[in-house]
Structure formats: C-alpha cells, structure tokens
UniProtKB/Swiss-Prot annotation:
One of its GO terms (biological process) is diterpenoid biosynthetic process. The keyword Cytoplasm does not apply. The VYDTAW motif is widely conserved among diterpene cyclases in plants and fungi. A motif (DEXXE A-type cyclization motif) lies at residues 665-669. This is Pimaradiene synthase pbcA. Belongs to the terpene synthase family. Disruption phenotype: Abolishes the production of ent-pimara-8(14),15-diene (PD). PANTHER family: (E,E)-GERANYLLINALOOL SYNTHASE, ENT-COPALYL DIPHOSPHATE SYNTHASE, CHLOROPLASTIC. Pathway: Secondary metabolite biosynthesis; terpenoid biosynthesis. Mg(2+) 2 binds at residues 665, 669. Its cofactor is Mg(2+). It comes from Emericella nidulans (strain FGSC A4 / ATCC 38163 / CBS 112.46 / NRRL 194 / M139). The lineage of its organism: Eukaryota, Fungi, Dikarya, Ascomycota, Pezizomycotina. InterPro entries: Ent-kaurene_synthase_fun, Terpene_synthase-like, Terpenoid_cyclase/PrenylTrfase.
Amino acid sequence: MTCADVTDLCTQASQLVQQLRTKDGELGFMSAAVYDTAWVSMVQKTTPEGRQWLLPKCFEYILRTQLEDGSWETYASDVDGILNTAASLLALETHAESRIASTDPPVEEMKERIGRARAALSRQLQAWSVKDTVHVGFEIILPALLRLLREKGHEFEFDGRAELDRLNRIKLSKFRPEYLYSARTTALHSLEAFVGMIDFDKVAHQKVNGSFMFSPSSTAAFLMFSSSWDDECEQYLRLVLQNGAGGGTGGMPSAYPSKYFEVSWVRGQLARLESKLTELQALTTLLDNGYSTGDLGIEDTDSLGEMLRDALVKGGGIVGFAPSIQADADDTAKSLIAVSLLDKPVSAQGLIDAFEGPMHFRTYHGERDPSFTANSNVLLALLNTPDAATVSPQIEKAAAFLCDVWWTADSEIGDKWNLSPYYPSMLMAEAFGKLLQVWSDGGLKSISSQFIRDRVSVCLYQALVRTLQTQNENGSWGSHSHEETAYAILTIAHACQLPVVNQLWTNVQLAVSRGRKFLQNSAGDKAEYLWVEKVTYSSILLSKSYVLAALKVSFERSYPACLANLFIVSKKRVIEFARFHSMLPLFSSMELWKVRAAIVEGYLLLPQLRDRRLAVFSRTGMEEDKYFEYIPFTWTLCNNRRNTFLSTKTLVEMMVISFLNYQADEFMEAVVGRLNSSQRSMTRSCIDEIFRDLKDKPELNDAIQAQSGPRNADANGHRILPQAKRIKMGSQLPSDVSRVLSAFVHHVMDHPSVKAAAPLEYERVKNELQVFLLSHIEQADDNGRFAAQLESTRDDFETARSSFYRWVSSTSSDHTSCPYSFAFYQCLLGFEQASHNAACFQTCEEKYVAEAMCRHLAVMCRMYNDYGSLARDRDEKNLNCVNFPEFAQAGPKSDAVRQKQLFSLAEFERSNMKRGLEVLTEMAAQDRAKMRMLEKVQMFCDVTDVYGQIYALEILRVGCDLAHDCFMLELPAQWSNST
C-alpha cells in the first residue's frame, strides 16, 4: 500500500499537536460563520461619543461576502444558506435603520442589497425541504429569525412553512423561560432563538468567561437585549474577532473555546452539547492510528494528558466540553480514551454511573434521541480501560445498540454533528475492531461468540464493503474530500480485524493505495464543511489529523484461532459461486470482486438463516434443500449491485421469506400435490378456513396479543410463533397439512411489519398469500389433467380452463410467490418509515401501477422458469407454458421454436415491468423519500429477475451443484441485449 514517508508524517503530526498549546489556551480552529458574524454585527454600544457599532469589521464582512444573487454562502446544506441569508438580511435592516457609522454603505446601496437578499431568501425557502434537514435546532432558530424579519416588514410564505411551524411547536411545547434562568442548559448556546420569549437580564448569571456557552451569536443577542452592558461579554467578542478563525478580518466562528476547551470538543446546540471541532479528537485520532507519544512530542502530549486527567478527577470521572459546563458522555469518553492512550488511565465508572441507560448510553441527561457516534465513543472508551472484563455488560450494551441501529438503518447512518456518512461508519469500525481484539484476547468471556459472529462482524463487514464500493474514480471518497477520504481509509483499516477480509485483501490494498495517493497528490488546505453547529463548519486542524492518521494507520492482520474459527467461508466456494453468478446477465457487468464481496456477505448471514430454517416447515422426508445456500447471495448481490444498501433487518427478513416460499412450494408439491382430488379439495377448504380465522386486522391484533402475551423471542432474538390452530378437516386429510399451512400463514401475517401496516396493505398481503397457496392446488389440478392425457398428445394441453394469457397472468404467476412477496416487502418498507398504519405507496395511482408492475414481473419470472424447465416438466408430466394451445401451431416436435416464442413473451413482460417502474418514477416527481423507495422496489425486481434467470438456465430444479456443475451451461442467445 502506498504510504508517505514516516518521518515526514511524524513531523507533521508533532507540529499539529504543538498548535494545541498556546500561552493562554485561547485559540480557535473553527471556520468563520456568516450567521454568527451577522448577529455580532448588530451589537451597538453606548459611548460618551454616542451609540456605535461594537465591531464594525463584522458588518464589513457581511457586506463583503454577499453573493451576486443576493444570498450568502451555502456551506454544505440548504439550511446553511437560509440561516446565513436570513441573519444577514436582518443585519442589513438593522444597519439601515440605525445610520450611526459613516462606513456603512449609502442608503440606495443598502436598499438594493436588502432587495436582493430578500429575493434570495424567498427562493431559498421555497426550494428547501424541511423534512430532509438534519441540523439540530433549526426548528427554533429559523422561526425566530423569520419572526424578527416580519417585524422589519419581511413576510415569507413557502411550501415547507407549515412543517417548520409544526416542528417549532413541538420543540417549544415544553419550554419554560425558567429553565434558562435556573439551570445551565445547552439552550444557552442559542439565546438569539428566544428573543421576545425570555428576560435576558435573568440569564446574566449563566455567563462563563464572558460568553454564553462559548457562542458569539448567543453572546451578541445577550448584549443586544439585556438592559445593561456587560464588559466581559464585550471582551469575549473582541477576543473571538482577533483570535478566531477570521483572524481579525471580521468573520466570527459559531463557537470559540477557552482553557482546556482547546483539548476538548467544541459543543453546543439547542438540544444538547455535542462535540465538533476538538483538539482532543485530533489527539486521540493520531494516537489511536499509529502515532506514539514520541512521534507527537512527549512534552506536549504529557501536558495535554495531565490537563485532561485533572479535569476528569475533579469532575468525578466525567467532563463537559469546558469548565463549569454540563458533563456529557461524548466528551467524557474521548477524554477517557485520550488519558488511556497517554498511559494516564482514569476509571470509567463515572461515565457508567452518569450516562448508562437501559438500552444504550445517554449523551447527556434529558437527551431525546440516542446518539450513534456517542455510543461508539463510549464503547471505545470502555474497551480501552485496563480491565475491560469488569465493564463487560456495559460493553455488550453499547455494542448491541450500535448493531441495532446499523441493522435498521436505511442505506447509511446519519449523524447530527457530521454530514458525512463515512464518519459514523469510521467510529463504529474503530470500536468494533477494538472489540474483536479484546474479545479474541479472552478479555470478554461473557460476550457470546454468536453475538460477535452474527451481529458485530456482519455490521463491520458491511461497513467495509460499502466503503470499498463507494470509492470515487480518483481514489477519493464522498465529495472528493480529503477528510472523508481519511474517514474511509480508517474504516477499512479497522475492519481488517475481520478474518474474512482475506477474501478481498487485494482489493483492500488497491483501494487504500488509491486513497492515500489522492491524499498525497492533491492539496488539502481547502475548508471542507462537514461538521454541524448552527450552520455547517470546517476545521483544517481536524481534517489534517484525520489525513495524517489515514496515511500512517497500520493494516497488519493477525487472527487468533478463536476468531478465525467463527467464520467458515471457503475461498474456493466463494470463487465458484462468484463465477456462476457472473454468468447471469444481471451481474455480467458487475466487477468480479464486488460479486465475491456480496457472496462473502451472504455467507456471514447464512448462520442466522439456518437458525430459522425449521421455524415452520420440517425437512423430514424432503430432498436436500440445495437452494438454501444461495438464497442469501441473490439478495446481497442485488443489494450491492446498485449500492442500494437496504437495511440489514429488511434484507434478512426477505431472505427468510424467500426460503420459506421455497419450502412452501416443496410442501405443496411433495405433500399436497400428491393428494387425490378429494383431498386437494379439502386442502382448499382448509386454507380458506385458516384465512377466515384471521378475521379483520384490528381484531387480529387484539387476538394475537391475547394469545401470545408480551412480544416473545427465543434465545437468538427471533419471534416465537403463536401455536397454530389445528383445523378439523376429517381423517382423510393428513394431520400435518392443516398444522403446517396454518403455521406458515401465521408466520407471515403475525410479522410485526404486517401487523403495523395500513389496513389496505395488510389485506393485500392476506389476499395474495391466500391466492399463492390456492394457486398451488389449481396448478396441481392442471398438472393432473395434463398428466392424464395420452403421452402422444402431451405436447398440447387439451383441457385448458382458460387462455394462456389468463392462466399465466393468474394461477401460474401467483404460483411464483412474487405477488404476495411484493406485498409483504412493501409492509417491511413501510414499517421502516412509520411504526403504525404504514404504507409503501400512498395514492390510488401509485398502488395500481405498482401492482401492475409486479404482475408483469411475476409473469416474466414464470416464463423464464418454464423456459428452462421444459425437459424436467416433460419428465414429471407437469404443465408448462409452451403446452398451451396457443403454441400448437409450432408443431409437435418444436421445443426450440416454442421456447423462442416463450422467451420473446417474457421479454415483452420485462418491457412492461420496466415501463411500470418508469411511471412510478414519474409519479415520484423527484420526491427524495419516494425515489429512495423506488430504489428498493427496483432491487426487489432485480432479485426476482435473478431467480428467473437461474430458472432459465435449468438449474434450480435440476438439483445440480450450483457451485460446480453449472459452468458448462450456456446462456440463451436472446439474452445478449435483454437486461
């Protein structure tokens, strides 16, 4: 792997650490923010000479940075530009009303600037998607700005206004001014959001070192709206102007630190203290990724370590981001990690006592939503304690929380404090990599190997593969960002603790080499706006620390036997399965290493499927289920092919429903299909009775709750099915038929996602599932009549109940399980968005087109199936599509002609399926949530298509070994341009 000169890297790292030490600790590395600068520019002070602007350079900065279209810079998110422009428009109006400085622009210029700013803000608000905004506190800050602008004569109406007002009401519903007066809360960081709501004089005592939570905008608001002047606040703002990132040019950061704040994370939002720019983070990043204290300068690291250790001891084992500020788990965890790496460990008991919750660690008291990144840091801190075994329960709790969040995440983990999806992945990979090390060394015997194998390792492997697959052509990641590229390289490095990485080692080396080459060959001094404060900000210091870490981190691999033995993944088997799947049109253009990576992921998930393999259907008397092994591959391949990255929870549930469908098909053919006509009729009545017993959805929910009591799970965390009702159908029907069918139906209908679905969605699953089972009996009846024909007449079906079109569009396609599985899949997708009355498609048009699209998909799959299974069907006397009278004109000895016609019809159905997807895309009208939903629907179509392509190669039913026997099979010539 390409690596920079080690000596040069150590020199750069040492210089970076030296920047953390100044004579008085007053140094800030956070980029200047127009929003805070605008607030400071509005502060007036009464002097003997009259009223004056306190810091006129700040208003000069606002004037200098207004863009041609009237707005101010949007750093990374739409809300950045909105807040910057709104605050600056307010500053323009304030200066226009108070002509107290000769340096302010002429009246006409001010009017022109105000007009352009107003128009720009109106455009920004109209184009803004409120529901897609992640910045914490915007729902309080922006309404306050709009309220102040309304007082200046500016009224703004926009599509997202109702949603913004709704969020504002929710946020303020429990707010009481007394909270700010009596306790030091994070809301003090944004006092400007409470103009007109609080008495500013009553928060004066909350000031620390001349500021309110180290926020220039909050401190400016206090000076503007309190009844008396505060010299300490003035001194603080002047200090920020001179020493902050603006360097005296007028720009003010969103937060400015002091004292050991410089070696702790800069935090502060309306909702919580959260770490952003942090010299502590820079220090721990370097120490944890290949740099020693000697590399960084013993004197510097010792003094920083002592400072942090003293703070922890004085705080009872916990710290906040600055003296006298509320302690939080994130800063505490980072501090514990740092002192441990500096060989000055402090007990983690204070962290546990203060922040441990029932299911995860709280970042601070009163936190509403748990933080993924905070729990990652907590886990890493606990793992770095001298005796990790003593905190094993807490380690498992934090790790389980991270796994649960990753398991249910849609595509990627979002973080409130960093816009890059690679940042949470990096922290999780670092924590899980350390967990594997400590567990392998025998330090965590209470944590089961199953948890390590089935949860931790799957999450870590997915983080690795998804990082590898999203690398840009020039070797970078994200928006061609140095900092994001460093995150990605560090993710890969820590994921190398997994033994299965050996399967991809060449690709890992190549990706890291390309990434490091990008970091070395391109300038990295440009600000990269990734960190979230009131607006997004950048930090050259943090960026450099991550880049230096990525250039030096080790990729050495050593796998103790206890860890390596958890993963039985044959490299030969992976290569053979990858070769086979690469033959299929859907994956023929997919890079071979990506195919292998998906196969390995499938193998990692396979043990969980085996645990549930006998949940419904017994294998007694059945042939070997060779299909079982490759079911996870079809899903992981399609999931990774387009980087869809469906949630792992949904992915696994669809794998389970896939093998249950095969088992149901086997049961209906091997057991029900061999019954006589009278018994099949009784089975039909049995199925009808099972579904009648389900009743309507509301009653069903009550009945299930009464029957099963609390939501039960077995030792593996899987649902325990309620005891299936035994249907009394007489002695002629084998007893296991009603029991097994009832268990299968209840497994599907009792699924939490189905139970939580909207009534229409629930009924659709119910109806499609019933049709699926009944279609097997209809198919068996058709097969029976077909088999009764003389062998000499068996090329054509003489007793067809309908046209070929009607049959293949109903009985035959229902028999594939595609329609009912799609209905079930929609419930899973809907449940990802809402826990009650969830629906994947909302409007009548969407539902209709989606169902029509699925029907074409099912028909296409059935035709592919019959295309490949003609010889088998003939041997087993089963009805095939080409036996319908419509194909008779081809003649009796015309298999090739009939198959060609059938394939042509399958391609017709494919075109209709594609058109359905196109119409759904048009209906989505660029709605982000709907477009994301359609990506998942496309993936379902891909999975179904894969099965059809496998069927067409006559593999699934012939019983050959997919990993070995299929490589001599040839693709249909017609397939060259079909996918």
